[in-house]
Amino acid sequence: MGRARPGQRGPPSPGPAAQPPAPPRRRARSLALLGALLAAAAAAAVRVCARHAEAQAAARQELALKTLGTDGLFLFSSLDTDGDMYISPEEFKPIAEKLTGSCSVTQTGVQWCSHSSLQPQLPWLNUSSCLSLLRSTPAASCEEEELPPDPSEETLTIEARFQPLLPETMTKSKDGFLGVSRLALSGLRNWTAAASPSAVFATRHFQPFLPPPGQELGEPWWIIPSELSMFTGYLSNNRFYPPPPKGKEVIIHRLLSMFHPRPFVKTRFAPQGAVACLTAISDFYYTVMFRIHAEFQLSEPPDFPFWFSPAQFTGHIILSKDATHVRDFRLFVPNHRSLNVDMEWLYGASESSNMEVDIGYIPQMELEATGPSVPSVILDEDGSMIDSHLPSGEPLQFVFEEIKWQQELSWEEAARRLEVAMYPFKKVSYLPFTEAFDRAKAENKLVHSILLWGALDDQSCUGSGRTLRETVLESSPILTLLNESFISTWSLVKELEELQNNQENSSHQKLAGLHLEKYSFPVEMMICLPNGTVVHHINANYFLDITSVKPEEIESNLFSFSSTFEDPSTATYMQFLKEGLRRGLPLLQP
């Protein structure tokens, strides 16, 4: 077998084969590494773009501030709903609609004309404000267009009586309003007289006060229903101008506008609206008693909103069953308590801005008819117009028939029913402070007492008091136990301080002093013996804190939750009341 010559190829030898492809796992790692590198590069690019966009936005913001000033930027930002520092046609549409006379809600979700929106997107701007900011005279709402006057209808003249709030009754007056700027209170200080001392209304405007068909004497109905509750939240504080009134809201808005040009018929906090009941019925007439919760916003840009919330507006109207004649009308803020107005004002242009709160007293805020409604045009038997004045210049005097009432209800009972309609917790009778302890002695019961800064049963109440009355105090188990085992009362701190300083009655002094010793801001709930000794008490803020956590997180056995009730607040308040009974009942005189 010979050898091959040099350079001559032989058959292929079985030497090493060609390199095989890389294993799949190694390839996956390579791809993952490549993907990570690309992702990192993309993220870096995004960050660079974001920083660039932020820098551009900051530059635009700075330029806008320099060009428009603080107040102008505030207005611009409120319209710029997407925050891109440009006003698009859709964003400008509300202003355009107002300028062209349209009040329709836009299709972009801007709902500041809608009463169904509880959190408006533009919280301080609405249909009735856009043109007011651009012109010196506010535009009338499209909901308030007058019907053509009917010469045959009667008119009612109403006068406004107004005495401004007494600054010395405000809590912050005690330290000379230290830390409160004059600008913040300028709207309040400048409100010294009614906006319209007198106004004339057609009787048909009062049709919303007529009861629904078949309404019984003393049975409440809602003229304007409340749309808020603890579950819906509250309306924005950061608004200047009220939304256009609708339907039955219009007459309430017009009446309240006699006091101030910016009444809000729907309050920010529950209960809202207006409730009424019949207190007298005759063949041709009704007497209707009503209670209205409304408030006013006193500031205009560039100042921040200042809210003025009277305790309530109450009153009555006597009108014919077809609303063609009004015999009498009166509306007023009750002034029998030492404090009757809640005030809240913002220190910034956003919903999260700091807010100051105070309470005070307004001596008079009242509307009253000067007399019964009279015909707009007086005709004789032949249909000819008669001069409404005698030759001497004196106006003609009308003689009105006496109304014979067939059913009547007392003012006190009607007021109680309206109060319960607004505040279900008033299904328990809350007696005046000293009267409650007299009753407790007579019935040998403990006193359930609530001491607070603002009134528990009207709109001057403070935040934690509102929470209590809308949750635990109106719950069925609490109502039952309070009615069965306690005499209940609530009091203003200011009134007990006055009682404590009154030298004429030492027993009342002692009662007030025992309460004030246990009081902590803002609300204190107490269980007392008939002699005023406090056997148990809890602060509202602490109560709300412990009911906002899980039961197992509460260390105190005294305020532990019961498995009987699903609601932690109700369960805890029930434990508070029962502990008061456990401590107090053995100490009652047999």
Curated annotation (Swiss-Prot):
Alphabetical list of PROSITE patterns matching this protein: EF_HAND_2
Leader peptide range in chain numbering: 1-43
Transmembrane residue ranges: none
InterPro entries assigned: EF_hand_dom
Annotated consequence of substituting residue 466 to Q: In CMYO3; decreased function in the regulation of ryanodine receptor activity
GO annotation (BP), single: L-ascorbic acid metabolic process
Record's keyword terms, sorted: Desmin-related myopathy, Disease variant, Endoplasmic reticulum, Glycoprotein, Membrane, Myofibrillar myopathy, Oxidoreductase, Selenocysteine, Signal
Biased composition (Pro residues): 9-23
Highest taxon in the source lineage: Eukaryota
Annotated glycan sites: 126, 190, 483, 505, 531
Record's disease association: Congenital myopathy 3 with rigid spine: An autosomal recessive, slowly progressive muscular disorder apparent from birth or early childhood and characterized by hypotonia, proximal muscle weakness, poor axial muscle strength, scoliosis and neck weakness, and a variable degree of spinal rigidity. Most patients remain ambulatory. Early ventilatory insufficiency may lead to death by respiratory failure.
Residue ranges of the region described as Disordered: 1-26
Function: Essential for muscle regeneration and satellite cell maintenance in skeletal muscle.
Ranges of residues in domain EF-hand: 67-102
Any one GO cellular component localisation term in the record: endoplasmic reticulum membrane
Tissues expressing this chain: Isoform 1 and isoform 2 are expressed in skeletal muscle, brain, lung and placenta. Isoform 2 is also expressed in heart, diaphragm and stomach.
GO molecular function, one term: oxidoreductase activity
Protein name (record): Selenoprotein N
